Amino acid sequence: MPNVQQTILVAPLNWGLGHAARCVPLIKALEHLGAKVILASDGAALNLLRAEFPHLPAFQLPSYRIRYQTDNMVWNIARQMPRITYAIRAEQWATERLVREHGITGIISDNRYGCFSGGTHNVILTHQIHLRVSNAALQWAANQVLRLALRKFDSIWVPDSATDPNFSGELSHPPLKGFDIKYLGLLSRFSGDQPPGLANATAGKNANVAVVLSGPEPQRTYLEQILLEQALALPHKFVFVKGKTGS
């Protein structure tokens, strides 16, 4: 009996370009395995996926529209929770519609907590399985909410190494008990030692350090300014890839 082709929905969060970019090697691997791939996101993340995979169907999902208006991350997220909760519900409705209309058999959701369906195998791609908050009581409560959200998924894929050295530290380690967790290692859309765009940017400049930025504003710009100040104080040569869409 021939194998049935799987139809996989890949849906990264639109929070900078990092989530969409790290889905690129997964999408290529799925295509190599013969799966039919459908893409879904919003904003710059969706634009990146459409540019990378113009031959694949791509659909708009509701936007979380998260904004950082203060330096307090907890307060920033807490005050936007009603809108985020509504967006997740709308995202879940949109996902169920895509599953019905396109015969989707599996979902890989990169940090989109509404992208799951009762009729599919659901995977969430995230490096954040432990939340870290300065207040112990808030941290416990936040992690209970996170675990409830993660329970909606059959598997958790962590884009990091299972052992030291790793990038995400306490956010991803140790693995959560009672969850199916797989550590994938680091994911990058770049093949080879250096992406062609970065090679062109550094050509003839003898740069020692490449700084690749992404993320939501205004935090991306704040980080850029801090790193620029530090770069000017160091003897090394830097090249900055600013991760600004439309530039």
PLM feature spans:
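Conserved nucleotide-sugar donor-binding subdomain of glycosyltransferases
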Residues: 74-114
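Short amphipathic alpha-helix
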Residues: 20-30, 45
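Donor-nucleotide binding loops and adjacent catalytic segments primarily
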Residues: 171, 185-247
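Active-site-proximal region of nucleotide-activated glycan assembly enzymes
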Residues: 118-183
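Conserved nucleotide-sugar phosphate-binding/catalytic loop shared by glycosyltransferases and other
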Residues: 5-7, 13-14, 32-82
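Short internal beta-strands
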Residues: 36-43, 156-161, 237-243
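A short, glycine/small-residue-rich beta-strand->loop->alpha-helix junction that serves as a flexible
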Residues: 12-24, 218-221
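Short, polar loop motifs at secondary-structure junctions
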Residues: 42-47, 107-114, 241-247
